[in-house]
A protein has these predicted regions:
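Alpha/beta-hydrolase fold catalytic core
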Residues: 1-60, 84-86, 125, 311-321
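Conserved HGGG/HGGXW glycine-rich cap/lid loop of the alpha/beta-hydrolase fold
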Residues: 52-98
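Alpha/beta-hydrolase active-site loop signature
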Residues: 67, 93-97, 160, 265, ...
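Conserved hydrolase catalytic core segment
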Residues: 125-168
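Catalytic active-site module of serine/aspartate enzymes centered on a nucleophile-bearing elbow/loop
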Residues: 280-321
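Active-site loop/oxyanion-hole signature of alpha/beta-hydrolase fold enzymes
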Residues: 80, 89-130, 295, 304
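Conserved loop-alpha-helix segment in the C-terminal half of the alpha/beta-hydrolase fold
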Residues: 251-290
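Conserved alpha/beta-hydrolase catalytic His-Asp/Glu region
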Residues: 165-167, 189-250
Length: 321
């Protein structure tokens, strides 16, 4: 074997990967706050976590789902209506959105700690959680641990029973390390979050794919290409963020609304039954036509249902004293 040729070929491949990475991130500016409200920064473990605050009343925290292009932009059609009667907080999880994206080991425990500390230190009051997908699983665990701090839950297509419930295996850790590898791993990541692939992901997420606009794709693309953007998604791919919620579900005592889109594809509505079997007193609601993001696809209906649910939960809490 001609080692010189092999090394030259490897160097060329790395060079090509570096060039591809440069093109993928070229002209990608920082993310703006596109949901309004007062912007804030939570200094947490040496990193800055972005959040917004809007309105007055009982506190509500909106937590976005977990994927390569995730951010609180997901809640852009819900913040203002819910803030009519509540103090509404949104948060960009560490590694996502406008928050810092440090090179570190992202885990379920990290995000549970972040959310718990944020509510304790920033919200500083009992706080209902509205969370989607994998973050819905985190909300379940937090609610089971501390029902006084989290007096009501709204879970949108949560995971933790049939999906994203298994602990990381060796193959998952290998996938995380592969994506986290400099240059080549970054090229793999950038190849997965092109404009085309993000559009396809969004079109799969909505029952009506005509709702996916070029402007929306651009926001998600920029979210997926901020400096350090690959680290948290690498942990997701590596199954480091999974959590089994079955035990926590059985221990929930606070009011909980379970929301689903009837045409959801990534989290089919049939999965709702597995949650209801473990917690029959869930208040279930199915939005149609809607896919995996019913809060964005049917915002008026979603906001009305959630506002009514929260008002009822708050009245019951007041009556209990």
């Amino acid at each position: 074997m001609n080692w010189r040729k092999l090394l030259m070929g490897g160097g060329a491949a790395v060079g090509a990967a570096a060039a591809f990475n440069h093109l993928a991130s070229r002209d990608v500016g920082p993310l703006e706050n596109l949901i309004g409200g007062t912007e804030g920064w939570f200094e947490w473990r040496g990193h800055r976590v972005a959040y917004t605050r809007r309105g007055q009343g009982p506190a509500v925290l909106l937590v976005h789902g977990v994927h390569a292009a995730a951010s609180s932009y997901e809640w852009r059609q819900n913040v203002e209506p819910l803030a009519l009667a509540h103090t509404v907080f949104t948060i960009d999880l560490l590694g996502f959105g406008r928050s810092d994206r440090p090179t570190l080991r992202y885990t379920t425990a990290l995000f549970l700690g972040l959310l718990s500390d944020f509510v304790r230190q920033v919200v500083a009051a009992p706080c209902a959680i509205v969370a989607s997908s994998l973050s819905g699983a985190y909300a379940i665990v937090l609610g089971a641990r501390d029902p006084g701090r989290f007096p009501a839950l709204v879970l949108v297509g949560p995971t933790g029973i049939m999906r994203l419930n298994r602990n990381a295996r060796a193959s998952g850790d290998f996938a995380r390390i592969a994506v986290d590898t400099p240059v080549v791993g970054t090229a793999v990541y950038n190849g997965l979050v092109t404009h085309r692939s993000i559009r396809a992901f969004l079109e799969t997420s909505y029952a009506d794919d005509a709702l996916v606009t070029d402007a929306m794709v651009d926001v998600y693309y920029r979210a997926a290409h901020q400096p350090g953007a690959k680290h948290a998604p690498a942990a997701f791919v590596g199954q480091q963020l999974n959590i089994d919620v079955r035990d926590a579900l059985r221990r929930l005592v606070q009011p909980a609304l379970l929301a689903w889109g009837e045409q959801a594809r990534m989290a089919p509505v049939e999965e709702m039954r597995s949650f209801l079997s473990l917690k029959p007193d869930f208040e279930p609601v199915i939005f149609s036509p809607a896919g995996d993001l019913p809060h964005d696809e049917r915002p008026d209906e979603f906001n009305e249902v959630v506002s009514g649910f929260l008002a009822k939960a708050e009245q019951e809490e007041t009556a209990r004293g």
